[in-house]
Amino acid sequence: LHKSIPRVETRYFITIYEEEELKNDVLLRFAKLDFNLLQMLHKQELTEVSMWWKDLDFVTTLPYARDRAVECYFWTVGVYAEPQYSEARVMLAKTIAMISIVDDTFDAYGIVKELEVYTDAIQRWDINQIDRLPDYMKISYKVLLDLYKDYETELSKDGRSEVVHYAKERMKEIVRNYFVEAKWFIEGYMPPVSEYLNNRLATSTYYLLTTTSYLGMKCANKEDFEWLTKNPKILEANVTLCRVIDDIATYEVEKGRGQIATGIECYMRDYGVSTEEAMEKFQEMAEIAWKDVNEGILRPTPVSAKILTRILNLARIIDVTYLHNQDGYTHPEKVLKPHIIALVVDSIEI
């Protein structure tokens, strides 16, 4: 239960509790009403995110990109389901969808020279850089800059627009590391596992997503963002957890498409071990990372429990999305679809 998504477990526990002989009918009815009322808000938010995604029309203009708006929103409900985080969920869902577009540009479509210019343009974060880009990159570049401008406008209402800077810097960081990985793939370079992990931790997206998850939280102040920039142990553990679980789940697919610079392959070469032994090592790293996340939740820190809980919930999402070493993000029908239906499609019958 500790590694499960709280909102998912809430939905399933209501069904289980309903079968109990000694159930409290008033409490059960209240739980159902509470779930359905909050679900109505979640449905409204999903509609907003879906309409934003549809209006961008990436499915037509960037056909190489994954169409995962619903799955992106599901992740945000895992991070925070409470009604006061409505704005935060919408912001985070849009960011997850956007980083998927950027990732696919590096991973499946761009060539080195174009990717180098794209990377530099994002580092400069200036719309005047757009003319340097090929047409297909202009589309995602403009949307990316517009998105963060919208965040600044929205947060300025509460005098918090300056914290968007921290999310921008994390976006620049991940793009730099995407470019390194793209060169590895194109050049057929297999780095030492230490170099691999040093770069790939950033491209796990969890530095970016954790920072972004705080944008819409009015309780998150500049000091919280500063704390996060220092990459505290709990964040490093969560990023490592995301990286190694993803590497285990996607190994066969990446190997099948000729990608030699995978974590498993690098570890096998460096230590002269079999695939099974490398998998076991990565699983061990995941277990250690979970212990470090739990330690970080329990130990005194300069930030509040509300801030720490986002990191814990992001860890939980990884465990659910990659359950039984399946890539539930790329293939949501395998893992996430039943949860999505339960949380944002089907209401509970009163």
Curated annotation (Swiss-Prot):
Cofactor names: Mg(2+)
Protein origin, superkingdom: Eukaryota
Annotated Mg(2+) 1 binding sites: 103, 107
EC number: 4.2.3.21
Reactions listed under catalytic activity: (2E,6E)-farnesyl diphosphate = (-)-vetispiradiene + diphosphate
Record's keyword annotation contains Repeat: no
Keyword set includes Lyase: yes
Pfam families: Terpene_synth_C (PF03936)
Cofactor note: Binds 3 Mg(2+) ions per subunit.
Main location: cytoplasm
Subcellular locations according to the entry: Cytoplasm
Transmembrane segments: none
GO molecular function, one term: vetispiradiene synthase activity
Motif (DDXXD motif): 103-107
Pathway assignment: Secondary metabolite biosynthesis; terpenoid biosynthesis
Keywords in alphabetical order: Cytoplasm, Lyase, Magnesium, Metal-binding
InterPro entries in UniProt: Isoprenoid_synthase_dom_sf, Terpene_cyclase-like_1_C, Terpene_cyclase_plant_C1, Terpene_synthase-like, Terpene_synthase_metal-bd
Domain notes: The Asp-Asp-Xaa-Xaa-Asp/Glu (DDXXD/E) motif is important for the catalytic activity, presumably through binding to Mg(2+).
PANTHER family: OS04G0344100 PROTEIN-RELATED, SESQUITERPENE SYNTHASE 31
Protein family per UniProt: Belongs to the terpene synthase family. Tpsa subfamily.
Stated name of the protein: Vetispiradiene synthase 3
Provenance organism: Hyoscyamus muticus
